[in-house]
Amino acid sequence: MSDTPLTFAPKTPLQEFWFYFKQNRGALIGLIFILIVALISILAPYIAPFDPTEQNRTALLLPPAWYEGGNPAYLLGTDDIGRDILSRIIYGTRISVFAGFIIVLLSCAFGTSLGLISGYYGGVLDTIIIRLIDIMLAIPNLLLTIVVVSILEPSLANATLAIAVVSIPSYVRLTRAAMMNEKNRDYVTSSKVAGAGILRLMFIVILPNCLAPLIVQMTMGISNAILELATLGFLGIGAKPPTPELGTMLSEARGFMQAANWLVTIPGLVILSLVLAFNLMGDGLRDALDPKLKQ
């Protein structure tokens, strides 16, 4: 009987990624939570028990159903004008997550393009772009966001745009560093010899090799965007009432922290959970995508 050596098929990149990602329990919990939130956000019109702006003047400041005096029809209670908190939380989460994705897509698209151009060409153009980025980074994010929103006029759309603009520098610096590291490698030189144009070199040849840090930054960027959007809503320069946005809900509940603490506690816990989930998933993505950490 001859001994035949065992052979194992090499893992595909996706299998290898999942192998390292699932080692991080926190990242798995974050991913599951985010998937549940995404599903709830998509199905919000069908699972929310009430319209988030509907007022019931006979059910003002009802506590959650498990409190004394609570009503099972209003599982998380009602606010000072009789709106269902659960419905507003569902729609508020939907707005926050959707806005977070829009912010990250906009900032990543512009930031990555600028970073690729800056890193590829270098010289005076690189110096100008980096000096502008340094100026933006020298100003605290929240302060710069407030300035941009004030210029544009406070609203949910303008708050989203302002946060996207302020988030651009991190993507520029990441992409520029990756471009400068990659542009002189052999595969890029081979593509040049084969006749690849500048746009093809930047966006098709080099960019895919710069994606790992960008994916991690995008995940962390969503959590930052959700937190900043809630902050602007709380300050009164984000979403306007009666829009069921989490920060706006906190702002409206400030006067009831003693009499109806659930109006502050529930939206606050939702914001905390969303930010924590995206951060945990970002940590897992970093561990799975960074070759140094794998070693």
UniProtKB/Swiss-Prot annotation:
Keywords: Cell inner membrane, Cell membrane, Membrane, Peptide transport, Protein transport, Transmembrane, Transmembrane helix, Transport. It is found in: Cell inner membrane. GO terms for biological process: protein transport. SUPFAM superfamilies: MetI-like. GO terms for cellular component: plasma membrane. InterPro entries: BP-dependent_transpt_permease (IPR050366), MetI-like (IPR000515), MetI-like_sf (IPR035906), OppC_N (IPR025966). This is Dipeptide transport system permease protein DppC. It comes from Haemophilus influenzae (strain ATCC 51907 / DSM 11121 / KW20 / Rd).
